[in-house]
């Protein structure tokens, strides 16, 4: 499997279970690209929604994608600390067009003090019925929520001290 090259600018595409495009993040710079992990950075980029709306992110962010985990993170650097928006979704794929994953609705927001909140359970329940998520998928996603919470408590991966700050310093070299 090929993977995005360090320093290259890519798009990130999220899809829904039914195969429809959900969201596109533009102009994201790859800081580390391997077959197992992609770390990327962006700042005030355009995000295109499937319904045609566009919006711009408000702050710099470090993005973390894992080829073996059913979650990814957007680590937002704000004046009062780092906020983490964790998406439950498939492990990433890379196909030269974009880094891609399927978004499965559930999210965990983590605050600078490492408190967290599980979001969008109602959206998950609705989409699981509408798009007929198989029972095996529910098992995988529930286990992934537990694994993600474990990472947060253990300060693993992007939650480790200095992880985001160190990658942000690398990102600034490419801006």
Swiss-Prot record:
One protein family per Pfam: DUF402
Highest taxon of source: Bacteria
Catalysis performed (reactions): a ribonucleoside 5'-triphosphate + H2O = a ribonucleoside 5'-diphosphate + phosphate + H(+); a ribonucleoside 5'-diphosphate + H2O = a ribonucleoside 5'-phosphate + phosphate + H(+)
Active site (record annotation): 23
Keyword RNA-binding: no
Binding site for Mg(2+) 1: 87, 103, 107
Record protein name field: Nucleoside triphosphate/diphosphate phosphatase
Annotated organism of origin: Shouchella clausii (strain KSM-K16) (Alkalihalobacillus clausii)
